[in-house]
Amino acid sequence: MARPSVGAKLWVIPDAYLPAKSTGSLQSHESTCVLNLGPRPAVVRLAAYFEDREPLTGFRAVCPPGRTVHIRIDKLRNDKKQGIPAAVPFALKVESNVNIVVQHTRLDSTQSALALMTTMAFPAGRSRS
């Protein structure tokens, strides 16, 4: 009997933000962490949504089967070589061709007292594509 698949194909992260500055040796950033427990590679597509501008799409990553990938949002570039701007609130949509589990982490080093926040993304269900 086949093992049930863990996760979902569509996830959302409503609160994301890249601080514009860092203090010390640690750079402020956000990471979207993907876990693929399935037998096939996960082709992961990300889109960023903003309060006052059109979405940025075309971001892509691959998570091999039985592995995890930590996608640094500050280093992510889409198919047009665009990055997500700093100091602007945004949300993320994360879609995959197979079920995955998604967690989101923020390291804020704008002050010497570092802040680390992590949360599970919301499993929104099946991808339409």
Identify the residue ranges that each predicted region occupies.
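Gly/Pro-rich, tryptophan- and cysteine-flecked surface segments typical
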Residues: M1-S129
